[in-house]
Structure formats: structure tokens, C-alpha cells
A protein has these predicted regions:
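C-terminal, well-folded lobe of enzymatic/effector domains
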Residues: 116-257
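Betabetaalpha-Me/HNH-type nuclease active-site subdomain
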Residues: 23-126
Length: 257
């Protein structure tokens, strides 16, 4: 009898230990310190598509396929658009998928959709924008929701739209001498310096490369980091992505059909 009792207690202790361990792991995996706010230059998105089956994959490639037109930007899109607002820990966009049961509900953002179709779209095919919103909410928004300011689907998307409007990258860069051009090329560090001059922090430049030798490199995106009160802070990862310091970038003019 005593042996059976000991075995039962031991089994309970093991189960409790595993349970607490899982809970501790879950808490750790959901921890984050700041936001990475990623924005795209829409014209550069016309030149490439995803090289994977998921919107989560960041491996893009230029396509020279007649099915993907370089005049893909809708007439109502004129500024930099949102890629995502990502809770981040130690320089990587983690955690992710923090609540599998909290699915994207488009009706929750019905009043924001007209703004989102101008500020948060997928290119070259804007008809897939709702898939991007779904992905961004379920992967990143459910983790951001631990912060009261963005604790609902509506609040999360509204905050990202607000940051996009406040940063106004098209005007900010133009004020620093960086405007879309068919002729001018800009160095990677000119974009980095513009972020530093405007916000006093280090951001990150994301580039897009054409396939083949001696092809152009485009400015594809800019990432600016914010703390949990949405004040700009230095990003932990600041080296350019898919390009290098000193490299010349095209900042293409939006092509209209």
C-alpha cells in the first residue's frame, strides 16, 4: 500500500513538473521587448513575388514574367505601405502564433478596410491583401495583444495604420533629399542616415535584387523599431538585408497603367 502511495505521489510530481515546465516554456516563448515596424516601397513590390508557399517566408525574388506587370500599384496607393508590426525579442521577430484559437475576423476591422487597402496591401496582386492581414494578425497580432494598447484585433491594425501615417516615409525621405527617381541612384547609407536624422535611432534597409549579373538593386523596405509606448528606439539588427553598405539602390518611381 505504501509503495503504491509513493508511486502515485511520484507520478503526480512528474506530471506537475512537466506541466509547469510547459507553462514556463510558453511564457518564455511569448515574451517580447519591442516592435519592428516594417514598411514596403510599393513599386519595388511589383518586380518580385514570394519564393515560397507562405506569406511568412521572407525569401523574395525578382520575376521577369509577363504575368506580373510593373504597373501593379493601384492608383489610390501613393505612399510606403505596411508589411507588418512585429513583437520582437533579441532582434528576431519572435514570438509568433501566440493564440491559435484567436483567428482573424475581418468584421472586426470593417471600418478600417478602406484605409488598409491604401496602406496595407499585397503586391503585385492586391487582391490577396486579406490573406496578408490574416497572417499578420494570427502570427504577430496575437502576441502583441499582451500589450493593453493593442489588445484587440482592431487596436492592433489601427496602431499600425497610425504608425504608417505618422512616419510618412515618402515625405520624410524626400525632405532628406531622397525621392523616387528614374535616373538617380542612392547609397544604402543615405537611407540609414535619413532614419537617424529623423528619429535619432538606427533602422534597417531591406533591398530587392534583380536576377542575373550586373542587375539593379532596389530599395524594397525600411524597418523602424519602437518600444512598447511606441517611441522610436535602435533596432538590434541594423545591417542591410540583401545588399551591403555602399551599394547603389534604385528608388523607382511608381508606374501607372
Amino acid at each position: 500500500m505504501e509503495t503504491k502511495r509513493v508511486l502515485l505521489l511520484l507520478s503526480f510530481a512528474i506530471v506537475l513538473s512537466i506541466s509547469l515546465g510547459d507553462e514556463e516554456f510558453a511564457n518564455q516563448s511569448h515574451d517580447w521587448k519591442y516592435f519592428v515596424f516594417s514598411q514596403w516601397w510599393p513599386q519595388s513590390q511589383c518586380y518580385y513575388k514570394e519564393n515560397a508557399d507562405s506569406l511568412a517566408d521572407q525569401s523574395f525574388r525578382i520575376v521577369n514574367d509577363y504575368r506580373f506587370r510593373n504597373d501593379c500599384v493601384p492608383t489610390y496607393v501613393e505612399n510606403w505601405t505596411i508589411h507588418g508590426l512585429w513583437p520582437t525579442l533579441n532582434g528576431t521577430p519572435h514570438p509568433g502564433w501566440c493564440n491559435d484559437s484567436w483567428k482573424f475576423n475581418e468584421s472586426k476591422i470593417e471600418d478600417l478596410k478602406s484605409k488598409m487597402m491604401r496602406q496595407w496591401i499585397t503586391l503585385p496582386d492586391s487582391s490577396e491583401s486579406e490573406l496578408l492581414w490574416k497572417h499578420e494578425w494570427e502570427k504577430h497580432g496575437t502576441c502583441a495583444a499582451s500589450l493593453p494598447a493593442v489588445s484587440s484585433e482592431h487596436a492592433y491594425f489601427l496602431q499600425a495604420l497610425t504608425l504608417n501615417r505618422q512616419t510618412n516615409l515618402l515625405k520624410m525621405l524626400a525632405d532628406k533629399g531622397l525621392s523616387p527617381s528614374d535616373d538617380n541612384m542612392y547609397k544604402v547609407e543615405e537611407f540609414e542616415d535619413a532614419i537617424m536624422k529623423e528619429y535619432g535611432v538606427k533602422g534597417r534597409v531591406i533591398c530587392v535584387k534583380e536576377r542575373g549579373d550586373d542587375q539593379y538593386t532596389y530599395i524594397g523596405g525600411i524597418r523602424i523599431c519602437f518600444n512598447k509606448t511606441f517611441s522610436p528606439i535602435d533596432c538590434l539588427v541594423t545591417e542591410p538585408e540583401r545588399c551591403r553598405e555602399g551599394e547603389a539602390l534604385k528608388y523607382p518611381v511608381i508606374i501607372r497603367a
